[in-house]
From Swiss-Prot:
The gene is apt. Belongs to the purine/pyrimidine phosphoribosyltransferase family. This is Adenine phosphoribosyltransferase. It comes from Thermoanaerobacter sp. (strain X514). GO terms for biological process: adenine salvage; AMP salvage; purine ribonucleoside salvage. It is an enzyme of class 2 (transferase). CDD domains: PRTases_typeI. NCBIfam families: apt, PRK02304.1-2, PRK02304.1-3, PRK02304.1-5. It is found in: Cytoplasm. Homodimer. Its main location: cytoplasm. Gene3D superfamilies: 3.40.50.2020.
Length: 173
C-alpha cells in the first residue's frame, strides 16, 4: 500500500453537499482495512519524534482518524464538537463561513495549561474548522504542536488561514 493508492481510493462526488462542490469521499479508505490501517500508520509516522500529550479532532470525520491515531500513539483524545453535543461545561469559538457563522465547542477541562496538542482532521479545505479547533485548544492554555491532515485541497489555500501553525498533510489534491 502507498499514499498514492490511498489518494486514488478517495473518490470525488460532484455537487455534494451542494451544487458546484466536488466532495472528497474517504469512505472507500475507511471500509478497506488495509488502507485504513495504512493511513493511520502514515499519520503516526509523520508525527515521529514529536512530544505531545493529546490529540484533538473536530467532528465528524476528524474523529475517524483522530481517535485511532491517539490510540496508536498512546495519548489521550479530545473531541471538538458542534454546539450542544458535549455534556459537561464547554468553551465555544465562533468562526466565519462563506455564508454566515458556525461554532465549535470543547470541554473546559479537556486540555490543561501547557499541554501539547496535535489536531487531526481528514481534509484541509478552507481551514476554518481547524482554525477554530486550534483557538479552542489555545484558549484552554494548550499549545498546538502541529496540525495533521490525511489530505489537502491545495487550491483552496487553507494553509493561509493556519499561518503560524506547523501543518502536515499526506496527500495533496
Amino acid at each position: 500500500m502507498t499514499l498514492e493508492e490511498i489518494k486514488m481510493m478517495i473518490r470525488e462526488i460532484p455537487d455534494f453537499p451542494k451544487k458546484g462542490i466536488k466532495f472528497k469521499d474517504i469512505t472507500p479508505v475507511l471500509k478497506d482495512a488495509q488502507a485504513f490501517n495504512y493511513s493511520i500508520e502514515m499519520l503516526a509516522k509523520a508525527l515521529e519524534g514529536r512530544k505531545f500529550d493529546l490529540i484533538a479532532a473536530p467532528e465528524a470525520r476528524g474523529f475517524l482518524f483522530g481517535a485511532p491515531l491517539a490510540y496508536r500513539l498512546g495519548v489521550g483524545f479530545v473531541p471538538v464538537r458542534k454546539p450542544g453535543k458535549l455534556p459537561a461545561e464547554t468553551l465555544s469559538y465562533e468562526y466565519e463561513l462563506e455564508y454566515g457563522t458556525d461554532s465549535l465547542e470543547i470541554h473546559k477541562d479537556a486540555v490543561l495549561e501547557g499541554q501539547r496538542v496535535v489536531i487531526v482532521d481528514d481534509l484541509l479545505a478552507t481551514g476554518g474548522t481547524i482554525y477554530a479547533s486550534a483557538k479552542l485548544v489555545e484558549k484552554l492554555g494548550g499549545i498546538v504542536d502541529s496540525i495533521i491532515f490525511l489530505s489537502e485541497l491545495t487550491f483552496l489555500d487553507g494553509r493561509k488561514k493556519l499561518d503560524g501553525y506547523d501543518i502536515i498533510s499526506l496527500i495533496k489534491f
